[in-house]
Amino acid sequence: MYCEKLRLIHIRNLDDKTIEPEKGLTFIAGPNGCGKTNLIEAIYYSSVGKSFRTANDNDMIRLGAEEGSILLTYCVHQTSHVLKIRMVRGQGKKFYLNDTPIRRKELLGLFRTVLFTPDELQLIKGAPLIRRRFLDMEISQVSPRYYETLLSYNRAVQQRNAAFRQAQLSGRKAEVDLWDMQIAKGAAYLVKKRLETVAKMDRKVPLLERYLTGEKETLSIRYVQQGEEEAHTEVEWYLTMLSQHREMDARLAHTSVGPHRDDLRFLLNGLDIAAYGSQGQQRTAILSMKLSEMEFIKEETGSYPVLLLDDIGSELDAARREALMTYLEKEKIQTLMTGTDPALAGMGTVIEMENK
């Protein structure tokens, strides 16, 4: 799988821009503010249906324009397809595959990407929600059933919480048995898939981390269920916990049990890297996890996703960059990388961007 062509019309600061990346490494060079990250953002948007920089699609549309479009041509199994995202200011967005309208849930998994940006440090330092989203997006790109179940689960949690709020207003007892069953079934499946994914990543990530650093450190990933030594995948366990917590949940109008409360923990030589790792160790750990995510997607689908590296030159030292480039070249992974110094491209193709 690889990107053949990207065209942006009225996106961010770009009026009409087309690039044709190489199958290997393409380095997007230019001064700050010229629009390098906008290209990475558009490719990622074509993959998952949203930006990694903003929750407001109006921010994507060029100032002064009423609409903007992203057109991405990708090749999979020797067949080319065209994804189009059309955004209209104040009216939302629409997705198309080969000119046929599709929904966002149908977009996920068509063209797969893995993203690494300077903000990725939040994957270790940030709130549990960031780590859950990372894991959910990874699995959703390879499993439509997982994404559907995740949507249904989140709706059931919202309905249960709404029933508690309504009961507080009416003075009546909340009827949540139906939502408890939906939540329990969804939770059991979601946690099972998460555990399977974490186990597969955990087999790869120590080897990748050692490859990048050349050191004999051991990086590992653990799935953490609040208050439990081990995560549970049984429907009956979730039903029991929801019942036991119902009185407290009713008072607080929230649901305190389930995968929406779980977390990931990253350990370096058995110690929590968020607390004990240096910033350099944390950045290398995140990159190792991103590469293990790529290996997981290849294992599940048969092909690597496209790797998007934004401003990687500021994140890694020369030795780690060289190790990364060697790995990407060896595995023949299409990579788009941004930076201000074209010398970082090595043997890759350079696309020069300029301020207008």
Predicted features along the sequence, with ranges:
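Conserved NTPase motor "head" modules and their coupling/switch loops across ABC/AAA+ ATPases, GTPases
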Residues: M1-P31, S170-V306, E315-A319, A323-Q334, ...
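Conserved lysine of the Walker
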Residues: K36
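Helix-to-loop junction immediately C-terminal to a conserved catalytic motif
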Residues: Y44
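Nucleotide-state sensing region of NTPase/ATPase domains
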Residues: S47-I124, P128-I130, I139-V142, Y146, ...
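C-terminal lobe/lid and adjacent interdomain/linker elements of RecA-like ASCE P-loop ATPase modules
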Residues: Q78-T79, R86-G90, A319-K356
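Long, charged N-terminal accessory/stalk domains
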Residues: Q122-L123, I130-S170, A174-D177, M181
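Walker B catalytic acidic pair
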Residues: D310-I312
